């Protein structure tokens, strides 16, 4: 990819760019956001928003809150570090929260089945395997419970199918 920039004069460092920022939107590959937070953002007092490839759990946590505009918009205002959930986690929150608001006294549980593509379009190095794979308790349920509460009656299954075209939620 460096060849794509051969006609440009590039100078400075990531730190010199960060010096002029109030907020960084970190879209680096999963796991790198935590390293960036510890090595760059925290030491320089820079706020950051992280992508869904990171985590808010355990010792690799990048943020205090998993953000979903339909669920916890106002709570994110004072946070220095926020994580935007994956597309599946965000979609579930946007669909389920209005149902919770309108029918909370009538709902006993939420069941969701995610039918997921095997690999994202840009993952050209990741082979689309001709098989179907089911995950009984994928991270999506735990992530959604981060903003609904750990005792939310949410039960999620994920099924990977051999395609790169879509995700589908059955709720």
What residue spans do the PLM features occupy?
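N-terminal Rossmann-like NAD(P) cofactor-binding subdomain of oxidoreductases
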Residues: 1-121
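Active-site-lining helix/loop region of Rossmann-like oxidoreductase modules
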Residues: 96-170
